[in-house]
Amino acid sequence: MSVASPSLKERLQAVKKTRWIRFGVAAVLFILFAVWLDNYYILPFLVVMADIYLTRYVPWTFWKKSKNKTVLRVMEWVDAIVYALVAVYLINIFFFQNYKIPTSSLEKSLLVGDYLFVSKLSYGPRVPNTPLSFPLVQNTFPILNVKSYIEWPSWPYHRLAGLGKVKRGDIVVFNFPAGDTVAVRVPNPDYYTLVHYVGRDGVKRNKEQFGEVVYRPVDRRENYVKRCVGMPGDTFEIRDNQVYVDGKAIENPRNIQFNYFVMLQPGYRFSEKQFRELGVSVDDRRFVSAERGWYEDLLALGFMPDSDGAFPSIYHMPLTPEALNRVKKYPYVSKIVQEPGAFGGEAYPLGYGRGWTRADFGPLWIPKRGETVRLTAENYLLYERAIRDHEGNRLERRDGRIFINGEEADSYRFKMDYYMMLGDNRDNSA
């Protein structure tokens, strides 16, 4: 004999007061979340929430009625794992995320291996471009070496309202802009630098060295952490390693570092204790006098070998102003030379031909939302990637003329704000 299913009225009358309260709190939070997200298409999910908390037409926890202890145990674990993954996914996207510092670009402020809890609410969380992804993995499953995300569906760029805006001097975690295309075996230097020096065909043909060339959506590009030094609308420039904004020198971070070559008198070497006192990590120091590849560079920098053609102890390492002053006081230090900016190779944009280096760069106007820049043959390379890759336009040059989305253009109005980021460890920052 079948038992009639309770009516909707009977189901609602049977709901305990505590469940009504829990549903009310959850519903209000969900509605506020939809407003914040500016996406009202998710509101029908309230019907599902009402069934979970109140009506229970769908047996969401059917497995709890099983008399099989193994089924109960397994399903409890599955339930807990699914709940945890969904919670971590939502927390990482909209509230805060854990990051590990991979390089020494902010050495002294943030050390290699440090773990950061980064607030997504500070500047407003970005809605994911690839919503179907596995939590806790950026773009590739370790060991398996396969993508940790699915490219469909793909959502356009959209950032939610936050508690504030980026300010000069802020330390910011962001997705590396030039990481849209990657040679998987050589992710650093970036693909565009490899193409500049090796050629596009050279990278694609030599898969043993460079691996497959893959495209990554914005939210799946590698995470970088730097300090903001240039704001939208600023005219940014570096002169002799000093940053200028709109023609005025800005205050340097307290622990700013530059690379130096330090030569000691014959018979002397730095001890581990001295390196620790100077704050120089093992990864950041090199004993270059023993490396053949440095011979010509050392001669060009003014270091002189002995009669046998050998150099005394010469170290290459980053130093803060405080550490540099300490080294200058060592009686057995015979010469200190700051690494020239040219040692870092060409600066952005590659192929610009103006001789810009990391020590002498610009001036460069940083694009600002709503502002217009006049496009010329001279500044085309400066704004090419921003207009084409970051703002989604079809940009090309034909017969000395510039075309945007098929129409000839002599100017462009930017849709987004742009920022200039630098590491405090200036000469060891990608």
Language-model segments: residues:
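Extended hydrophobic leader/signal-anchor segments used for secretion and membrane insertion
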Residues: 1-430
